[in-house]
């Protein structure tokens, strides 16, 4: 039994699916050293995808040498002291809802200025939280589980606050995986159905 027509049909079906590739989006939140934005909200973009940040007071870019072993670079608040960081009782909310339409495979967050004894708190709108300690200072920490919970509840709001001491937001990084277009999936399905029919005919001959 010659199987080359079957193999050819299979190759055609697979060729209908575009090659998938991962994409990485990175948002860095300190682009200007020690400057207030003069507003409590701003949208940051990476490859055309926007994340909106809203502070409890005006946003502040901080960029200076480390203190107490902690990095002092990131997005903070203009109020209420000279540190210009997120203090207890203050917060910055990131809106990640623009990512819900993508096939997200990983989300990491980097906080800065977390000295010994200080903590940062990252929560969704449904009381699921991740705590950052001094060992996480200026390091990417996965919050993919938190993002999954946010997407499940259809709320993209992520609140960054200080548990103790004060913190800064350094970076958000997201990886996504391409999803085949619906038309490509239909073509693949049609090809596989045809392949199955050919196999049945060959076996019945």
What are the residue ranges of the model-derived segments?
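Short proline/glycine-enriched turn/loop motifs at strand-loop junctions of beta-rich domains
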Residues: 104, 114-117
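Terminal, low-complexity interaction segments
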Residues: 129-178
